[in-house]
């Protein structure tokens, strides 16, 4: 696996997020070796994310109703993929499998913004996973997203899988352009 940064002694939740990037890249490479490619979707990523977060001591809820989102109809509830808490630290994580260089993340970002607004000190992240050839040239059409750390890629000789994580930042914070 390749990454351009040493990750010793990272603070939480950044350490857990780095482990998620490493874990997902290797896990999906393993599934590809098992010829499981037909079943690939973002849902394949849920179990390893849950395992990594719980191994890091987080209490994790999946498919959590998103606070602060108005619901159009009865039963039409927007849900966050993950909400993790540990020692007063809380964050939401939305997961997206990128099949092309330009992906629709509008609903994911709306949920992350609503979560941050409803949860004063909480953080919110978007995990984007896919083939390295796609993630290296990924175009996200959203403001206030800042990449956390470097892209992580499992380079095992066949298809290379990569993972990036972005933090949803408040509009009043300085922004930097990321790919």
Could you say what each language-model-derived stretch is?
Residues 1-55:
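Interdomain/boundary linker segments immediately adjacent to catalytic/signaling cores
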Residues 37-38, 55, 59-88, 156-161, ...:
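Active-site metal-binding core of divalent-cation-utilizing nuclease and nuclease-like domains
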Residues 34-35, 72, 136-140:
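Short, flexible/disordered intra-domain loops and linkers
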């Amino acid at each position: 696996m390749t990454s351009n940064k040493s990750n010793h002694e990272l603070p939480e939740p950044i350490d857990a997020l780095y482990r998620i990037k490493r874990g997902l890249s290797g896990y999906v490479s393993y599934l590809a070796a098992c010829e499981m490619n037909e079943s690939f979707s973002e849902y394949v990523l849920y179990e390893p994310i849950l395992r990594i977060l719980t191994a890091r001591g987080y209490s994790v809820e999946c498919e959590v109703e998103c606070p602060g989102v108005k619901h159009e109809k009865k039963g039409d509830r927007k849900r966050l993929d993950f909400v993790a808490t540990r020692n007063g630290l809380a964050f939401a994580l939305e997961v997206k499998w990128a099949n092309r260089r330009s992906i629709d993340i509008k609903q994911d970002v709306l949920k992350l913004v609503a979560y941050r607004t409803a949860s004063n000190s909480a953080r919110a992240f978007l995990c984007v996973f896919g083939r390295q050839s796609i993630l290296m040239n990924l175009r996200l059409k959203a403001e206030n997203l800042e990449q956390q750390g470097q892209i992580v890629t499992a380079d095992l000789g066949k298809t290379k899988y990569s993972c990036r994580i972005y933090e949803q930042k408040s509009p009043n914070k300085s922004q930097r352009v990321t790919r």
